Amino acid sequence: MFWLLAILAYLLGSLSFAILLSRLTGNPDPRMSGSGNAGATNMLRLAGKKLAVLTLLGDMCKGLLPVLIASLAGLTLQQQAWIGVCAVLGHLFPLYFRFRGGKGVATAAGMLLGIYPPAALLAVLAWLLAFYLTRTSSLAALIATPLTLPLLAWQEPAALVPMSVLTLLIVWRHRGNLRDLFAGRERHF
């Protein structure tokens, strides 16, 4: 059951709401415009608030639904977390879009919401505060994601290793943003 759900989570994660919504509405492909990222922040820049919110919610659901299904199937918390990681991997490397996806922040937030809601709340609050102070989405994500690890280590240690792997993946996907941050070229709102 674990492997079946892991594969299905990856396939669900491979659905890119940013790309699909752009195609449906005649907006530019987010991978080819703006920051080049197929995610909610770039959709905000390219297509406005409505499509950005729809992208955010869709991407979060891609992380949340597989975890909830795994929970209903009786899988352990660690297995649920790994299934969530598979959904995020689908978002990062989508099968349907030549493996060029987003950065995984919203999908990881959805996964975290299913695993341990207080950690998701902490991540969202940290992201909002960091974004408010810096007006930089990538920096907010790089601050918020690792902050969940101590809380998980304390409350849900079974999810710590999968979430640590996910954190490393998200930081790796932001490596260009890190270069731009250090060079003073990162885009702000």
From Swiss-Prot:
<feature type="transmembrane region" description="Helical">
    <location>
        <begin position="111"/>
        <end position="131"/>
    </location>
</feature>
<keyword id="KW-0812">Transmembrane</keyword>
<comment type="function">
    <text>Catalyzes the transfer of an acyl group from acyl-phosphate (acyl-PO(4)) to glycerol-3-phosphate (G3P) to form lysophosphatidic acid (LPA). This enzyme utilizes acyl-phosphate as fatty acyl donor, but not acyl-CoA or acyl-ACP.</text>
</comment>
<comment type="pathway">
    <text>Lipid metabolism; phospholipid metabolism.</text>
</comment>
<feature type="transmembrane region" description="Helical">
    <location>
        <begin position="1"/>
        <end position="21"/>
    </location>
</feature>
<keyword id="KW-1003">Cell membrane</keyword>
<dbReference type="Pfam" id="PF02660">
    <property type="entry name" value="G3P_acyltransf"/>
</dbReference>
<keyword id="KW-0472">Membrane</keyword>
<dbReference type="GO" id="GO:0008654">
    <property type="term" value="P:phospholipid biosynthetic process"/>
</dbReference>
<keyword id="KW-0443">Lipid metabolism</keyword>
<keyword id="KW-0594">Phospholipid biosynthesis</keyword>
<keyword id="KW-1133">Transmembrane helix</keyword>
<dbReference type="GO" id="GO:0005886">
    <property type="term" value="C:plasma membrane"/>
</dbReference>
<keyword id="KW-0808">Transferase</keyword>
<comment type="subunit">
    <text>Probably interacts with PlsX.</text>
</comment>
<keyword id="KW-1208">Phospholipid metabolism</keyword>
<keyword id="KW-0997">Cell inner membrane</keyword>
<dbReference type="GO" id="GO:0043772">
    <property type="term" value="F:acyl-phosphate glycerol-3-phosphate acyltransferase activity"/>
</dbReference>
<protein>
    <recommendedName>
        <fullName>Glycerol-3-phosphate acyltransferase</fullName>
        <ecNumber>2.3.1.275</ecNumber>
    </recommendedName>
</protein>
<dbReference type="InterPro" id="IPR003811">
    <property type="entry name" value="G3P_acylTferase_PlsY"/>
</dbReference>
<feature type="transmembrane region" description="Helical">
    <location>
        <begin position="77"/>
        <end position="97"/>
    </location>
</feature>
<feature type="transmembrane region" description="Helical">
    <location>
        <begin position="151"/>
        <end position="171"/>
    </location>
</feature>
<keyword id="KW-0444">Lipid biosynthesis</keyword>
<comment type="similarity">
    <text>Belongs to the PlsY family.</text>
</comment>
